[in-house]
């Protein structure tokens, strides 16, 4: 059984980098667009530096899905620039573990965690259907095909 846990610690970006690249590898040719590929590579390099020197920008919480000792999915919850919100980024699942509900479990854990801190989750995504199924609502739609979405806990407070 794959376990999902929340940890306040750094994740080895080399281990996480492979999952990030798999998650953005969604073109019909099986390759990331070059611009996205470069952005992902740069972000992974930044994460490696942060990991190696122990520097953490705003507080981050990692939601990890492991199959025994193997990292098979994760999400990162971090302080948002908006008061009362956490950003949820890099929800990634190993391609061999997809369609088992891990992405939903990771996202639900993030929403539950934010609620314990009296916060809401805000995400920017190109997969709004996935988050709508979990109760998120669209706050804005951008011409680029990306959406800004809010967690279900916010609706309950309005």
Where in the sequence are the language-model features?
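A short beta-loop-alpha structural element at the N-terminal edge
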Residues: 2-21, 28-31
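Active-site rim helix/loop that mediates acceptor-substrate recognition in acyltransferases
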Residues: 20, 24-62, 66
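Conserved beta-strand in the GNAT
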Residues: 62-64, 70-79, 85-92
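Active-site beta-strand termini and strand-to-loop segments that position acidic
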Residues: 66-68, 150-152
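Conserved acetyl-CoA-binding loop-helix of GNAT-fold acetyltransferases
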Residues: 93, 99-112
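Conserved active-site alpha-helix within GNAT-family acetyltransferase domains
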Residues: 119-121, 125-146
């Amino acid at each position: 059984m794959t376990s999902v846990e929340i940890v306040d610690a750094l994740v080895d970006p080399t281990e996480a980098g492979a999952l990030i690249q798999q998650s953005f590898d969604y073109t019909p040719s099986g390759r990331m667009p070059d611009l996205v590929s470069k952005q992902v590579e740069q972000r992974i390099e930044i994460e490696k530096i942060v990991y190696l020197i122990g520097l953490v920008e705003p507080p981050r919480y990692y939601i990890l899905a492991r199959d025994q000792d193997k990292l098979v999915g994760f999400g990162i919850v971090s302080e948002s620039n908006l008061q009362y919100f956490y950003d949820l980024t890099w929800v990634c699942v190993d391609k061999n573990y997809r369609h088992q509900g891990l992405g939903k479990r990771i996202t639900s854990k993030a929403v539950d965690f934010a609620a314990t801190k009296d916060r809401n989750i805000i995400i920017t995504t190109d997969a709004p259907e996935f988050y709508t199924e979990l109760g998120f609502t669209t706050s804005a739609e951008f011409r680029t095909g990306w959406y800004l979405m809010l967690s279900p806990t916010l609706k309950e407070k309005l």
